[in-house]
Each structure stands twice: as structure tokens, then as C-alpha cells.
A protein has these predicted regions:
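Active-site cavity-forming subdomains of large catalytic enzyme subunits
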Residues: 1-209
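Long, well-ordered alpha-helical segments
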Residues: 191, 211-220
Length: 220
């Protein structure tokens, strides 16, 4: 792209490629591949991302098999409640927002908005936060996607804040682990058969406690 002066058309065409790749792979000829994509609410492509699972529109801009989710900062919800504007940015112009959460994110985001108003950032778009939120909810009712997940809540409650920022969850939104270009998060699943922990006197809680402790250690 760089050598031919070409430009990327945003995240949607690449998500379409990932979607088709996942469908092309299956498990034992029965279970098709699965993938989930999370996008932060400040991203310039968020409005098109919301429509990925729609059954109408240009099918080249759709990913019917991909699970999608919104990764929402608290600041966006504040803007919704206060009926304020929300600014969408290209990640090229705000490279550190992805790695920030909480007060750090809010401070950086407000500074980028100031730069946009001053003309120092050219690629951006301003929308009403309530309109964008309404579209999120509408798409959720219409297609079941994208899911609603909260970036700041996940990071504030993480026991691994020292290890970096949580950028997403998994396909079932049951884990929240930090990731970076060198570190991926893995969802290991396990189950405990409660029948094996029941005696004539009822549930053997000590045995169950020992089993769960061992299982968690094995999954770690």
C-alpha cells in the first residue's frame, strides 16, 4: 500500500476477510470456525462496524458469521447521559487511546478533541453521543450484535493491571485478560461433575473446594 500510494479502506474490509477465513475452517467437518471482533467507540469506523451483521446493504461490507462487540469507555456514557457530542478519530491520529483507560483515557481523549477543534487533527468526525448509542441499541435488537461491553469496568476490576491494558474479551465475553502484540489471551474451559462430590450427607464442600483449586491450577 505504501509503495503504490494506496490507502486502507478502514477495518471493515479486513474484518470481512477474517470472517470468510473463519468460515473456511471447520472442526471435524461439523463445527465451523468462530471469531469475535471488538471495536472501541471512538474509532472512525464505528458506525459502519455496527452494521456488519445487517442483512441489507452492500454484502461486501458485511460479516454475517463474525461475532462483534462494542468496547465502550465511561466517558462515552457520560456524554450520552449529558446529551453531548462525541468525536470519532482515526487511530493513526490517536495511537495511544487504545492503551489507556479511566482517567488517563479521558484526559488524552479531551486533549485530542482540543487538537481537532484547533485544526491540528484533520481526520475526525463529530456525532451526538445519544444518536450513536441509539444506533448501538437498535443494531443489538435487530441483529444481536455488536454486544455491549465496558472497557473501563473491565480494566478497573482486573487483577492484572500491572500486566497491561485489556483490549477485549472473548467470543463468550467470559474472560478479560490483557493482550499486546507479544502476548495473547487464551480461554481455557473446564467443568466439575458435582455428582462426584455428593455423599449420603449431602455436598462434600471440602472435596469440592480441593477439586476446584486443582482445576483452576490446571487451567492456569
Amino acid at each position: 500500500i505504501k509503495g503504490t500510494n494506496g490507502k486502507s479502506q478502514g477495518v471493515v474490509p479486513f474484518l470481512k476477510v477474517v470472517n470468510d477465513t473463519a468460515v473456511a475452517v471447520n472442526q471435524g467437518g461439523k463445527r465451523k470456525g468462530a471469531v469475535c471482533s471488538y471495536l472501541e467507540t471512538w474509532h472512525l469506523d464505528i458506525e459502519e462496524f455496527l452494521e456488519l451483521r445487517k442483512n441489507t446493504g452492500d454484502d461486501r461490507r458485511r460479516a454475517h458469521d463474525m461475532n462483534t462487540a462494542n468496547w465502550i469507555p465511561d466517558l462515552f456514557m457520560k456524554r450520552v447521559f449529558n446529551d453531548q457530542e462525541w468525536t470519532l478519530f482515526s487511530p493513526n491520529n490517536v495511537p495511544d487511546l487504545h492503551e489507556k483507560h479511566g482517567k488517563e483515557f479521558e484526559s488524552a481523549y479531551l486533549e485530542y478533541e482540543r487538537l481537532a477543534i484547533a485544526g491540528e487533527i484533520e481526520v475526525y468526525k463529530t456525532v451526538k453521543a445519544s444518536d450513536l448509542w441509539r444506533k448501538m441499541i437498535s443494531m443489538l435488537f435487530e441483529t444481536g450484535h455488536p454486544w455491549i461491553t465496558f472497557k473501563d469496568s473491565c480494566n478497573v476490576r482486573s487483577p492484572q493491571q500491572h500486566a497491561g491494558t485489556i483490549h477485549s474479551s472473548n467470543l463468550c465475553t467470559e474472560i478479560t485478560l490483557n493482550t499486546n502484540p507479544e502476548e495473547i489471551a487464551v480461554c481455557n474451559l473446564g467443568s466439575v461433575n458435582l455428582v462426584n462430590h455428593i455423599s449420603e450427607s449431602g455436598l462434600d464442600q471440602e472435596k469440592l473446594k480441593k477439586t476446584i483449586t486443582t482445576a483452576i491450577r490446571m487451567l492456569d
